Amino acid sequence: MKQNSLNVKQKKLSKIAFSHVGCEKNLVDTEHMQGLLHKEGYEVDSNINDANVVVVNTCSFIETAREESIRKILEYTNQGKEVIVAGCMAQHFKDELIKEIPEIKGLVGTGDYQKIAKVLDRVEKGEIVNEVSKIPEFIADEEMPRFVDKNKFVAYLRIAEGCNYNCAFCIIPKLRGPQRSRTIESILSEAKSLAKKGIQEIILISQITTNYGQDIYGKPSLAKLLNELSKVPIPWIRIHYAYPTGLTDEVIRAFKDSKNIVPYFDLPLQHSHPDVLKSMNRPWQASLNESILEKIREEIPSAVLRTSLIVGFPGEKKEHFEHLLQFLDRHKFDHVGVFIFSPEEGTAAFHLPNKVSPEVAEARKDNVISVQQNISREKNQIYVGSKMKIMVEQISDNNELIGRSYNFAPEIDGTVILSVKEKIDLKNYIGKFVEANISFADEYDLYGETIKIL
């Protein structure tokens, strides 16, 4: 790992490790906390077994994420580690966590991770710390130390934090606070710094990326940001969490005009039927779904479309679900993530009537997966026989290269698996782009052979 700042203070006694649960926004928080602690003289270790303090950065988006977070907390407290709980569960259950698990030494809210060093100092003095602001307001800028994993060539770049929407199923606005954007200058500065560190791909993230700048510039400013970022020498710039309302002509033009902004559209649409979307408190979306998808395909034929969907939402009838399946068949997304509705206390959907049974919801999820697998297989077959630009990220146990083309985002999509004829050290390929012949495809991955390093 590398850190942004070299101004490291005198070494402290505690050895700190981090355990991360949840999304990439949480990951960025973790990287900042690691950087801050290193700057203050703490030894930050990736090996939890060697650490005496573990910071568990938690997720509270859905029940399964909370269960995983609690499992990790209990695992480390049972090992005798001093545990500090950070992130969304600390924000969500700031009064309950320490009562239920008294072994926890401290809590750090989603708007308070910049205080992690002071929290740890207080914990080392024997204090039980509850550092959770009622309303998160902080967002890190390019000046805050951050660890960037030297073994990876992808970095997430947060352009805003928080959300002003109130989707009926979502607890995030209560956990992350209102939207607050960074300035274009701040984002550009960090992007340039990441480029100097050898990062080959940056992924722009926020709760709603297409709403970027509304709070500080008086209007959404993603198009202007993209135009500026396109000048930064990073081969791939990807955008996650784009909403249909924000995909204006200017934003789509920025995708078209920029060589390094990949035509990959991550659109968390959640559903297709107007009745379900209205219940989700997203009534504006139904009329836009069809038109924006058609517009993207028309303007950018090479566009890759990903969406995420919720099935089993209260009141979702059979005809609503059939509408969703027809929607998938009609628009043929490249990638789809599907989740069963999770009732979250504190959200409007928690009290909605007409609950869908778990058995029906599970069957609907399986149905969506089956339909999408067939679509994805057909989409991937298009690449067979073509040459593609691949970023190589690792070596498999079978001595093959594993990487991605622009149409695959890390972690959530497939990979490209390549054989190599040349008798050279495979490590020479890591972090580089290669040209490859694609010879086979399944519903998730592409397979082929390297031609040359680009």
UniProtKB/Swiss-Prot annotation:
It catalyses: L-aspartate(89)-[ribosomal protein uS12]-hydrogen + (sulfur carrier)-SH + AH2 + 2 S-adenosyl-L-methionine = 3-methylsulfanyl-L-aspartate(89)-[ribosomal protein uS12]-hydrogen + (sulfur carrier)-H + 5'-deoxyadenosine + L-methionine + A + S-adenosyl-L-homocysteine + 2 H(+). Residues 149-378 form the Radical SAM core domain. It is an enzyme of class 2 (transferase). Its cofactor is [4Fe-4S] cluster. Binds 2 [4Fe-4S] clusters. One cluster is coordinated with 3 cysteines and an exchangeable S-adenosyl-L-methionine. Its main location: cytoplasm. Residues 381-452 form the TRAM domain. [4Fe-4S] cluster 2 binds at C163, C167, C170. This is Ribosomal protein uS12 methylthiotransferase RimO. It comes from Prochlorococcus marinus (strain MIT 9301).
